[in-house]
Structures are given as structure tokens and as C-alpha cells.
């Protein structure tokens, strides 16, 4: 195969990887919930999974209540929801 053909194949495989959604059958349902700061007035850095962007993002957590889409570290969020 020529080098041009290899680059074309690599480009197509990369495009397929980007456009093909990750299977969400094993992802917990709470990963689909919106970020919820809760009712307390604290200001704590937290992370939530954003299902449209398929990544974990930062938000400010108040310190109580909220929902389960709330992680102390981005790594914990990625392990739970983005894997």
C-alpha cells in the first residue's frame, strides 16, 4: 500500500473514532444528570460528566444535596462516566 493510501486509511479511522459515539450501555444513568450545586452555600470545586460533550467538566458544588453526577476529582469522573 502506498504512503498516500496509508494516510487516507489513518484519516478515515480517526474520523470514524471521533464520530462513533461511545457505547453508553455500561455508563451509570446518573452520568446523564445535569450538574446540581445543591442547596448549601459552600463553594467547592467539583466535576460532572457532560453527556453531549462526552467529557467531564468543572462546576461549583455547594456542599450538600445535589445528585450523583458529582465527583471530587476529574479522574474519578472519567473512571465512572467517560470510560
From Swiss-Prot:
Pfam families named among the record's database cross-references: Kunitz_BPTI
PROSITE patterns: BPTI_KUNITZ_1, BPTI_KUNITZ_2
Signal peptide (UniProt feature, chain positions): 1-24
Coiled-coil zones: none
InterPro entries hit by this protein: Kunitz_BPTI (IPR002223), Kunitz_BPTI_sf (IPR036880), Prtase_inh_Kunz-CS (IPR020901), TFPI/VKTCI-like (IPR050098)
Disulfide pattern: 31-81, 40-64, 56-77
Cross-referenced SMART domains: KU
Primary localisation category: secreted
GO molecular function: serine-type endopeptidase inhibitor activity; toxin activity
Protein name per UniProt: Kunitz-type serine protease inhibitor mulgin-2
Ranges where the BPTI/Kunitz inhibitor domain occurs: 31-81
Miscellaneous information on this protein: Negative results: does not inhibit voltage-gated potassium channels (Kv).
Compartments (UniProt record): Secreted
Gene3D superfamilies tied to this protein: Pancreatic trypsin inhibitor Kunitz domain (4.10.410.10)
UniProt record similarity statement: Belongs to the venom Kunitz-type family.
Entry keyword set: Disulfide bond, Protease inhibitor, Secreted, Serine protease inhibitor, Signal, Toxin
Tissue-by-tissue expression: Expressed by the venom gland.
SUPFAM superfamilies with a match to the protein in the record: BPTI-like (SSF57362)
Gene Ontology cellular component annotations, sorted alphabetically: extracellular region
Site feature Reactive bond for trypsin, where: 41-42
Function, in words: Serine protease inhibitor.
